[in-house]
């Protein structure tokens, strides 16, 4: 009888291992050497929240946004940004002090299967932050995906969450975080501190650093001077086959925090449809 129990137990264990194995197989990362790359520039945006973007006296591009143009449609030229970086770094738009490097490239790759979306980001994080106060994390990398209810989400990317009255903005409330007036973003973040957990959150009427339902997993690290960060999350919520989802990337480099990040403009990620970043079906 004892032998019988042992056999039953080992079969049960074997079954559990098989089930676990198949879960892992479902989340098998793609062969990144076969996945197309799209490089975007991330930049220090200073004090240019959505209110600034939509104020004609500050930003002549407001007219284009109102006509339905995207920020990137106007500002990305031959893979670079046509901004006046001197103005962005000036006291007018960065009253505290700008980082030494105003922009740098991030290469994005995306793939998906029935269950999951996989996103890989590679970049060299610059030193020279103005205010390196995050002692635990040399680098943090976040991505946000907008749902269909975010006004102008496919034009402005993450700017719909970026407001002049949020923390680290001049004269703003230190407790007030990113928020949207309507709609929601799914948020995921990698932190470089040893043992830091993946952030699976959202931005609604405030920023929530947990409570997301995307089952976000992330692996990140540095080889030489290049960071590679790979997110795995459920193909769910705003992400679905047949959809092009607005997204943005933010990198806090050199222990930066708050608004002292380098951000991308809004791009789209397409799952089975055309987009700025086309996700490769596995």
Report residues per predicted region.
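Bacterial N-terminal signal peptides that target proteins for export
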Residues: 3-12
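The canonical Cys-X-X-Cys-His
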Residues: 68-78, 162
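Beta-strand-rich interaction surfaces with strong enrichment in secreted/lumenal proteins
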Residues: 106-109, 216-222
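Acidic/polar low-complexity flexible segments
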Residues: 27-58, 136, 142-191, 237-282
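Bacterial N-terminal signal peptides
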Residues: 12-21
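Short helix-loop boundary/capping segments
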Residues: 177-220
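Short, well-ordered beta-strand segments enriched in hydrophobic/aromatic residues
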Residues: 116-123, 227-233
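Sequence context of c-type cytochrome heme-c attachment sites
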Residues: 28-68, 82-107
């Amino acid at each position: 009888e004892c032998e019988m129990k042992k056999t039953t137990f080992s079969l049960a264990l074997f079954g559990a291992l098989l089930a676990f194995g198949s879960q892992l197989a479902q989340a098998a990362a793609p062969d990144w050497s076969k996945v197309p790359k799209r490089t975007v520039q991330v930049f220090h945006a200073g004090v240019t929240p959505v209110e600034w973007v939509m104020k004609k006296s500050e930003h002549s591009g407001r007219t284009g946004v109102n006509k339905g143009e995207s920020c990137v449609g106007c500002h990305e030229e031959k893979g670079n940004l046509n901004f006046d970086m001197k103005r962005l770094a000036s006291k007018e738009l960065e009253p505290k002090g700008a980082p030494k490097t105003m922009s740098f490239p991030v290469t994005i790759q995306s793939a998906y299967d029935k269950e999951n979306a996989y996103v890989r980001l590679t970049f060299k994080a610059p030193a020279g932050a103005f205010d390196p106060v995050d002692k635990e994390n040399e680098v943090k990398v976040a991505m946000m995906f907008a749902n269909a209810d975010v006004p102008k989400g496919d034009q402005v990317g993450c700017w719909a969450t970026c407001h002049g009255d949020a923390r680290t903005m001049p004269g703003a409330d230190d407790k007030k975080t990113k928020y949207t007036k309507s709609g929601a973003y799914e948020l995921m973040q990698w932190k470089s501190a040893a043992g830091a957990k993946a952030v699976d959150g959202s931005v609604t009427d405030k920023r929530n650093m947990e409570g997301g339902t995307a089952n976000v997993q992330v692996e990140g690290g540095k080889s030489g001077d290049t960071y590679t960060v790979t997110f795995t999350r459920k193909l769910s919520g705003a992400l679905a086959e047949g959809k092009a989802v607005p997204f943005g990337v933010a990198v806090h480099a050199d222990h930066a925090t708050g608004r002292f990040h380098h951000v991308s403009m809004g791009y789209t990620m397409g799952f089975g449809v055309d987009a700025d970043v086309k996700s490769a079906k596995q």
